[in-house]
Regions:
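Non-heme di-metal
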Residues: 1-153
Length: 153
């Protein structure tokens, strides 16, 4: 297959790896955080990213092999390090800055899955990316709810 193309599995792996890197980021920030509110937020986000990484791993295990091996002509960049470097946090971020970064990363995956779902040629591949899109949109809502609860404290 030409290098312009990617398999469905590569997109799922990208999501898993990005969630794993985000968990590491939140864990690292938590080690240096001083405010209890920030620590609580980072702990929540770390557990949440771990859950998302595990959810994508289960999704991959439970999916038919054929659909994961399907090729897509649409081929955006899937570089986890580039995605991580796209957003910058100060050394001691506030809870607002952390929430904004979390939502920005969610948007990265939401936009990717939405675009791939729109460009996919067959209905099964479209369905896979619509499911991934729903999973990420639910995550974004959970992060927003956690942020609201934190602000009310």
């Amino acid at each position: 297959m030409p290098s312009c193309c990617k398999q469905v599995r590569e997109f799922v792996d990208f999501g898993k790896h990005l969630h794993g890197k985000l968990k590491e980021l939140y864990d690292d920030l938590n080690e240096h955080a001083q405010l209890e509110r920030v620590k609580m937020l980072l702990d929540f986000l770390s557990r949440h990213e771990q859950h998302m990484e595990e959810s994508l791993a289960r999704f991959e295990q439970e999916s038919r092999l054929g659909i994961l091996e399907a090729w897509l002509e649409y081929s955006p960049g899937l570089d986890v390090e580039a995605a991580m470097n796209k957003f910058h946090l100060p050394e001691n971020p506030t809870s607002d800055e952390i929430i904004q970064i979390a939502l920005d990363f969610d948007d990265t995956l939401v936009n990717l899955y939405k675009e791939v779902a729109e460009k996919a040629n067959d209905s099964q591949t479209k369905a896979v990316f619509k499911n991934l899109l729903q999973l990420e949109e639910k995550e974004k809502i959970q992060v927003a709810r956690a942020a609201m609860m934190l602000w009310e404290m």
